A protein has these predicted regions:
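Residue-level hotspots at or immediately adjacent to binding/recognition sites across diverse folds
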Residues: 29-357
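Bacterial N-terminal signal peptides that target proteins for export
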Residues: 4-18
Length: 357
């Protein structure tokens, strides 16, 4: 993040093992048909191998895709449930968490070779955050006693053995992030909360009417960014905080118009003063903490989820299934994959820089 906050965690035993069907980018892109039916790399070659750059992407039923070389080659891991991953988080190359559309929380301590179920929730899960092997947070909504749905944050401080619940009424929660075991931020469509006690208590810090706030990231306990868009204009919005979320300032994104809704911010990632925000038109990027911005073009797809292992290595998923990767902070993006390889687009990605093997 300067230490980049990834998301992830846990451990316990009952659930899920590996499948590492080693799948090179050629297998990932060539998929089912004969070699003469379509090119092996319909979007061009995959990135050059970057040993030690690990990433995990979810969205498929019962499994996820994983790379240990920055996206040059991929393998499949299985968690053996007929559910799709909704979010994934890793705090290092070994320790990770995953949540599914069935409300299941899983954890790994070996980089995803084996996954264990640590919690079956009653929530429609939206997001996941983690800071260590013991601490994780799950955001979603569940049925209220009086009818309707109530926004909820579940938290564990013992690797998933026990969980506590905090309710937020009718708020439409969208994302959560933690910089360490105590300092975190929580988003709703138009609100931002902060905590300094691991989520036991939350303080409402900012309300932004007529917005959709979609994503939050932190690089340490003080520096944070929130992305979203203005519901009246469709323009992208990025807010920054230098005091752990107590106060916020709007950043100006001076980029050329790209059509109605084309710049609506979806997800934000940060590393060492670099920022990336996905939008339908490409990736909005800053190399100076948000003072200046550019729209980075991508060769295929509409970027959705994004994660940065460091200031150079960034990976993103798309609506239309190609996976995007950059080894130079987004100056050049490469796309690889084939639409008939994945059943559905990948919806979340986590990335971590570890030692090269």
């Amino acid at each position: 993040m300067d230490r980049r906050i990834r998301r992830a965690r846990g451990i316990r035993a009952f659930g899920a093992i590996l499948a590492g069907v080693a799948l090179s980018a050629a297998a990932l892109t060539a998929c089912a048909g004969g070699a003469d039916e379509s090119p092996a790399h319909p979007f061009g070659p995959p990135p050059e191998a970057s040993p030690g750059i690990h990433a995990w992407a979810v969205g498929e039923a019962g499994g996820l895709l994983v790379t240990a070389d920055g996206g040059a080659t991929w393998s499949r891991q299985r968690f053996y449930l007929s559910q799709r991953g909704v979010d994934v988080a890793f705090t290092d190359v070994a320790t990770g968490w995953l949540v599914t559309d069935g409300g299941t929380v899983l954890a790994t301590t070996d980089g995803g070779a084996e996954w264990a179920v640590v919690k079956q929730t009653d929530l429609a899960v939206k997001a996941l955050a983690a800071s260590s092997a013991t601490c994780a947070w799950v955001v979603g909504s569940g049925a209220a006693a009086a009818g309707g749905d109530v926004a909820t944050v579940l938290r564990t401080a013992d690797g998933g053995a026990t969980w506590r619940r905090t309710r937020f009424g009718m708020a439409q929660l969208t994302d959560v992030v933690f910089a360490d075991d105590r300092h975190g931020l929580l988003l709703a469509l138009d609100r931002i909360w902060s905590t300094t006690d691991g989520g036991r208590t939350w303080k409402l810090r900012k309300t932004v009417p007529m917005t959709v706030l979609t994503s939050v990231t932190m690089t340490d306990v003080r520096h944070a960014w929130v992305a979203g868009w203005d519901t009246q204009t469709g323009d992208p919005l990025v807010f920054t905080s230098r005091d752990g979320g107590v106060t916020w300032r709007a950043l100006r994104l001076r980029v050329s118009p790209a059509g109605p809704g084309a710049l609506q911010a979806r997800q934000i990632a940060a590393a060492a003063g670099h920022l990336w925000v996905t939008c339908p038109a490409g990736v909005l990027a800053s190399r100076d903490g948000g003072r200046s911005w550019e729209l980075q073009q991508v060769p295929a797809g509409r970027p959705a989820a994004i994660a940065a292992a460091d200031e150079a290595h960034v990976l993103a998923t798309t609506e239309t299934q190609p996976i995007l990767a950059s080894v130079d902070g987004g100056a050049v993006w490469l796309a690889f994959g084939r639409a008939d390889f994945l059943e559905r687009p990948l919806v979340a990605v986590a990335a971590v820089a570890g030692p090269a093997q």
